[in-house]
Amino acid sequence: MSGIIGKNIGMTSMYDESGFNVPCSIIEAGPCIVLQIKTKEKDGYDSCQLGFDEKKYKNTNKPLLFFFKKFKSTPKKKIFELPIKGNIKSGNIIKLNCFHENELVNITGFSKGKGFQGVVKRHGFSGVGERSHGQHNRSRAPGSIGAGSDPSRVFKGTRMAGRMGNKKVTLKNRKILKIDLLNNFLIIKGSVPGAKNSYLIIKKLK
């Protein structure tokens, strides 16, 4: 299998073989059930849908209940689509035994949302002018956003204040330090995108 779905549990630290204290992230990954298999003949490409994290029946709408019933699965909170690697069939259970320690993986998730932020925090602007000689309220200002009557518009891509964070982020070549098959935990070196309990996709390198 090319990857697995996980949930960000939090961060801790552990000592490596050299005695260095290494920060690491704990991810609860799997077990995931294989739902729909998409083929090139029928859908135009090859992939499979994985379901992860149990969901209550009362919180699931009828179309989704019929969808999960079709593939003989209980309702799941998250469904992600991943490329197929190997002989995968609908109903198979994907666990962490497809990974091994010291393997490098790519981790995809959504970064923490920061809300509406100004240009100093969002883009690293320095503000306008010096903080002296009577200036007051310009220390975090964006400054000019363009010329006047020519071109009579603001160019696309001009860096301005706006919503920050909550973007799709992929961290590449993250090392697996330890695998806990009993509790379905992956210990990854360093940090991962998103807040606690946010969902992640852990992919093998191609």
Curated annotation (Swiss-Prot):
A single GO molecular-function term is: structural constituent of ribosome
* Top-level division of the source organism's lineage: Bacteria
Q: Which InterPro entries match?
A: Ribosomal_uL3, Ribosomal_uL3_bac/org-type, Ribosomal_uL3_CS, Transl_B-barrel_sf
Q: What is this protein called?
A: Large ribosomal subunit protein uL3
- Role summary: One of the primary rRNA binding proteins, it binds directly near the 3'-end of the 23S rRNA, where it nucleates assembly of the 50S subunit.
Which PANTHER family does the UniProt entry name for this protein? 50S RIBOSOMAL PROTEIN L3, LARGE RIBOSOMAL SUBUNIT PROTEIN UL3C
**Subunit comment for this entry?**
Part of the 50S ribosomal subunit. Forms a cluster with proteins L14 and L19.
Q: Which organism is it from?
A: Karelsulcia muelleri (strain GWSS)
Q: Per the UniProt entry, what are the Gene Ontology biological process annotations, in alphabetical order?
A: translation
Q: Which gene encodes it?
A: rplC
